[in-house]
Amino acid sequence: MRIVFFGTPTFAVPTLKKLLANPDIEIITVVTQPDKRRGRGNQLIPSPVKQIAIEQQIPVLQPKSVKKNARTLDFLRQSRADAFVVVAYGQILSPEILEMPRLGCINVHGSILPKYRGAAPVQWCIARGEKETGITTMLMDAGMDTGPMLLKAYTPIALFDNAEQVGATLGQMGADLLLETLSKLDRAEITPIPQNNDDATYAPLIQKSDYLIHWQDSGRRIHDRVRGFYPHALTTFRGQPLKVMATIPLEDLGQLPPELQTKDLSHLSGEVGSIVALWKNFGPVVQTGEGLLLLKEVQLSGKSPRSGGDLVNGSRLTIGEIFVQ
């Protein structure tokens, strides 16, 4: 089977590797986003997908606009591909491109459609407190993740799973599900199922404002957003930005690590956003709009991530100090 692979981030790498390892599949070319300047040296850095393609000596196309680039469109028209596989590519394909391959354009999407259509399904699913997610393969149409569904696979989200961890799990699941999808499509063993638009929810591009912690929210809601937007959740402390990397909501002692289950919380309260306890081996405890939140891992501006316990021991925190949105 001849495949053109469209993908960009780390999430897409397991699927590309799985396809490359299959002797019945030929990757004609990889289409990925243009290199981006990153880091202190402002160097051009290739996407994770491009790096794999280069290692495997697969031709790479990087149009700024896949819909308008004449060279890319000519190549795709002449590719004689059986399918275009799209995994977190980052650009919308034109109706012309969607109609080119024999089996269509097959997307590996990081949610259980029609929930969490859009650019950031893994992050928003966790940020909104979902306890289950998964992968959907679908035939792409002109809409944003609106095409008929092919196969689904499910996985639970644990209380302390973050977007990086769930994304890694889904990336591997997507690779397996995509191979099964291609095989069954080729043998006409799948009946595409239309999505119910009434059940749709959305996962838009994440904005910098989404990273800001609102301490008036409940501890559980803040915890979910810290996990979902990992490692970017942000507050202000002593006039400086502070990333919050991991938290523990103290709402249900039974869900806490054993060493915390015996803590007496009955006397802890204070102004929203303030430190109400300093647990030397664990971290500061902060009053939220509803409940208490332990800061388990943080990152001061310009520093490496550190445990909440290290913050307590090394920063001379005091009860009553305020974290600001």
Curated annotation (Swiss-Prot):
PROSITE patterns: GART (PS00373). It is an enzyme of class 2 (transferase). Signal peptide: none annotated. The keyword Chaperone does not apply. It holds the Pfam family Formyl_trans_C. GO terms for molecular function: methionyl-tRNA formyltransferase activity. (6S)-5,6,7,8-tetrahydrofolate binds at residues 111-114. Keywords: Protein biosynthesis, Transferase. It catalyses: L-methionyl-tRNA(fMet) + (6R)-10-formyltetrahydrofolate = N-formyl-L-methionyl-tRNA(fMet) + (6S)-5,6,7,8-tetrahydrofolate + H(+). Belongs to the Fmt family. This is Methionyl-tRNA formyltransferase.
